[in-house]
Amino acid sequence: MIKERKTVMKKYYLQVTIDSNLDASTKAVQDCNKILHQNGYEPFEINLYKSGNKYIKKVHNFLAFNHLNKIDEGALLVVPHPLYVNKKYIDILEKVKQKKHIKLAFLIHDLDSLRKLFLNAQDDFEYMDHKMYDISDYIIAHNDCMIDYLVTQGVNREKIHNLHIFDYLCESNNTIKFDRSVSIAGNLDEKKSNYLAKLKDIKAVHFDLYGVRLNEDILASNITY
């Protein structure tokens, strides 16, 4: 009996570089790429030209996006949204989805049709946002407010997944450090606070004492009065 081989869905994230610069994207996009990579997703890299001859740049960028046609049949592709490139990229994604039967997951960082920061390109952003709503299989949003807005735009709530966070990775040291000093104030009479005589044995902590009736014989290198 011949067993059918199970096909494993290939998982990619779209990594767009500008003039071969991996740091051209925002921190949020870079963080998401790092998280996806750590979870078994592979980069599907597209390098665009921003500098140089405008005709060469236009042809190169068109061919670069058409490289998407080489993606594996039935793959899952995570796409950061928006991409600040020519709006035709979203049409190419739609054609690749139809041709290669891939699943598209859009991870929203901003909705420029909502922010309206680039008024001279507002029509383009409106087009890209609404095309994204239509061709997405999954949408990853930041919070409930964004999800509610997407639903008002006709997006099926079932395909929206809530991250509940906005930023992603923090470069700070996660090690918690405690101040190894303790202040004690009040009546320092050893009859009332007999534990004071034992503080000198706790070498890793410095004690600052404030109050009256202290027997100064208990003072040590780790005790200040």
Model regions: which residues?
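Carbohydrate-associated surface elements
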Residues: C145, I165-F166
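Helix N-cap/beta->alpha junction signal
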Residues: H81, H109-D110, N143-C145
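N-terminal pre-catalytic "stem/leader" segment of glycosyltransferase-like enzymes
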Residues: M1-N86, K97-K103
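A short, active-site helix/loop in glycosyltransferases that binds the activated sugar's phosphate group
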Residues: D134-E158, S193
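Short, well-ordered alpha-helix to beta-strand connector turns
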Residues: G40, E73-A75, H101, I135-D137, ...
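A short, histidine- and acid-enriched strand-loop-helix "catalytic/donor-clamping" loop
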Residues: Y84, L104-Q122
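Membrane-proximal helix-turn-helix segments that form the acceptor-binding/catalytic region
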Residues: N66, D72, K95-H101, A121-Y138
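Conserved catalytic-core segment of nucleotide-activated headgroup transferases in glycan assembly
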Residues: L169-C170, N174-I223
